[in-house]
């Protein structure tokens, strides 16, 4: 697999379209950080780590409202292996006028675009969610 982040986002997107309550994804430190940001921003209910060693998986519990509509309507990869996208702190765009979130990889780790702008650090824009 050449792009594990795109694979993670696709698994989440497929689980949402199939109305699953949870999705299992092979674990890595980067995927755990993305799951943490999704939870902090309120897009997923929770996530847990299952298994040991190389068999570890991240189980993400998806969030739906009373009508069965997912809190995630759009989930897209921005920077990809063939076309990296780097932005300074002032260049990081607001997603849907602040209703969405960018996931940015900075020198201080993964954070939301809002946090990166607040701390005045730029980085690689990995994904966009709303």
Question: What residue ranges belong to the model's regions?
Answer:
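Core subunits and conserved enzymes of cellular information-processing
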Residues: 1-130
């Amino acid at each position: 697999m050449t792009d594990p982040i795109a694979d993670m986002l696709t698994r989440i997107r497929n689980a949402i379209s199939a109305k699953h309550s949870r999705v299992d994804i092979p674990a890595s430190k980067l995927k755990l950080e993305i799951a943490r940001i999704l939870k902090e921003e309120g897009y997923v209910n929770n996530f847990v780590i299952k298994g040991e060693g190389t068999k570890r998986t991240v189980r993400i519990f998806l969030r739906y409202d009373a009508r069965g509509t997912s809190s995630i309507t759009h989930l897209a990869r921005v920077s990809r292996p063939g076309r990296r996208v780097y932005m300074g702190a002032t260049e990081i765009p607001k997603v849907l006028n602040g209703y969405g979130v960018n996931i940015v990889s900075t020198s201080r780790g993964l954070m939301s675009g809002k946090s990166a702008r607040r701390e005045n650090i730029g980085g690689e824009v990995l994904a966009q969610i709303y």
